[in-house]
Amino acid sequence: MGSAEPISAIATFENVSLADQTCLHGEDCDKLRKNFEECLKLKGVPEDNLGIALGLCLYSCATIGTSNKVNVQPTSTFIKASFGGGKELYLTHGELNSFLGSQKLLEGKPNKLRCFCRTFQKDYISLRKEYRGKLPPIARANRHGLPAEDHYLAADFISTSTELTDLQQSRLLLARENATHTEFSSESPVTSLKQLGRGLGTGR
């Protein structure tokens, strides 16, 4: 039996696609990005605005939620944005769902929208960093015990990531705990900013 190729021989992991039900990786991620950018261009988004258009779509998903239980009318507005020079993006929920349903890369995924958003989580975080303070707050951030500066962590598709600081990741984990907290739990939910971001190594 021949020896396996050392992992150091892999120049980059960007071209590695892994079996994952929650998001796409490597070449699959690149293909999905290209397909969605083509969709955006057909909708009138200029080439140099494709990045921010994707980010805004992800932010719209964050505010609405990506649960399969979310019920919205197919004809209702998903996103509307102007890019100057008469260029405007207008996309309905039905059009977004049609795009997701047409992607073979998403076949078999239990939640296509959430998989799509998690695939481009880095773009979502980058948008927040670039336009910090300009984006409308996500309403459920308060309910989850998140401070205003990190309201974007209330997105139900975001996961722990190297793009987030340890403090932000600890806040994210506490917010998830609060989101699943029930009235029958014996533990009290976070109720003050002092309880937030105490580090990942806490006993709570």
Curated annotation (Swiss-Prot):
Region (Disordered): 183-204
Ranges of biased composition (kind: Polar residues): 183-194
GO biological process: transport of virus in host, cell to cell
InterPro entries reported in the protein's UniProt record: Closter_coat
Keyword annotations: Capsid protein, Helical capsid protein, Transport, Viral movement protein, Virion
A GO CC annotation given for this chain: helical viral capsid
Principal place of residence: virion
UniProt-annotated location(s): Virion
Protein function: Component that constitutes the body part of the virion. Also acts as a movement protein that is involved in local cell-cell movement via plamodesmata. At least five viral proteins, CP, CPm, p6, p64 and Hsp70h are essential for cell-cell movement.
Family according to the record: Belongs to the closteroviridae capsid protein family.
Name of the protein: Capsid protein
